[in-house]
Regions:
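Short coil-to-beta-strand
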Residues: 24-32, 125-130, 194-201
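A generic secondary-structure signal
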Residues: 55, 59-63, 92-95, 158-161, ...
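Conserved alpha-helical substructure of the radical SAM core
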Residues: 2-119, 123-124
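Short, surface-exposed basic-aromatic patches at helix termini and helix-loop junctions that form
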Residues: 91, 118-125, 147, 188-194
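Conserved radical SAM core fold
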Residues: 37-39, 76-80, 110-115, 127-148, ...
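Hydrophobic faces of well-ordered beta-strands that scaffold small-molecule active sites
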Residues: 15, 69-71, 104-106, 128-130, ...
Length: 251
């Protein structure tokens, strides 16, 4: 692959990398990845091999036309790949950097974080995104493990480890039918209890299908399917954002 030329007016190319595919230690009710395993039951191809990792890193860097390159690691649950995988990724980034500045961000549910993981993230300047749906009563409604056990306390333990090691982190929160009507409780938890400076809110709207293969969630093209019970309405989403905006401006 011919290496791209760095230009001052170019736009960056971003690719979200999923080194474990849909594999996760949680089974959140609203997750659109819960059914992905059925797509590769006969021939699993969802875990990135070392060969594919090197090919991807080399070609991704060479395709960039800007001096900064951002790698975004996403899941499934990213920390279900061992630490050695990400150490290998950094080695390959250095090998193919070609004078470019390389940055990394990673999204995780936070339940598998340890001191060792956090030390690695801090030493290598990773930005860590934590998936957490607000206070315990909101978070644990849908974000449970595969045995139906709540995950809030493990996530909080992970956040405290990030703070302990001085890792830069932010939050990604799903707005669903259970928490959408409590925007101030939601927002103040992140601001006052977590001291979180950056929050991404994601509204959940999913349609159901009655497919013969047992898959529940419908495609984007199917616009007349029944809404999943955890979905929010346009009115809820608008009120949620406006209420938080007013609180943010005033306080």
């Amino acid at each position: 692959m011919k290496e791209a030329t760095i230009t001052p007016f170019a736009k960056p190319l971003y690719i979200m990398t999923k080194p474990v595919g849909a594999v996760c230690n949680l089974a959140c009710d609203y997750c659109y990845y819960l059914e992905k395993s059925k797509l590769y039951e006969e021939q699993p191809r969802h875990v990135m091999s070392d060969e594919l990792l090197e090919k991807f890193i080399k070609e991704y860097i060479q395709s960039q036309t800007m001096p900064q390159v951002l790698f975004t690691w996403h899941g499934g649950e990213t920390l279900m790949r061992p630490l050695v995988f990400y150490k290998k990724a950094l080695e390959l980034q250095k090998k193919y950097a070609g004078g470019r500045t390389i940055d990394n961000c990673i999204q995780t549910n936070g339940t598998l974080l340890t001191d060792e993981w956090c030390e690695f993230f801090r030493e290598n300047n990773f930005l860590v995104g934590i998936s957490i749906d607000g206070p315990q009563e909101f978070h644990d409604e849908y974000r449970k493990n595969k045995m139906g056990q709540p995950s809030f306390y493990k996530v909080m333990k992970g956040i405290n480890l990030l703070k302990k090691h001085g890792v830069e982190w932010n939050a990604m929160a799903v707005v669903n039918d259970y928490n959408a009507d409590y925007p101030l409780d939601f927002y103040r938890f992140f601001r006052d209890e977590l001291d979180c400076h950056y929050i991404q809110f994601t509204p959940i709207v999913e349609r159901l299908s009655n497919r013969a293969d047992g898959l529940r969630l419908s495609s984007l093209k199917q616009k007349d399917g029944e809404l999943a019970s955890f979905s929010i309405t346009p009115e809820q989403w608008g009120n949620f954002l406006c209420t938080i905006f007013d609180e943010w401006v005033l306080n």
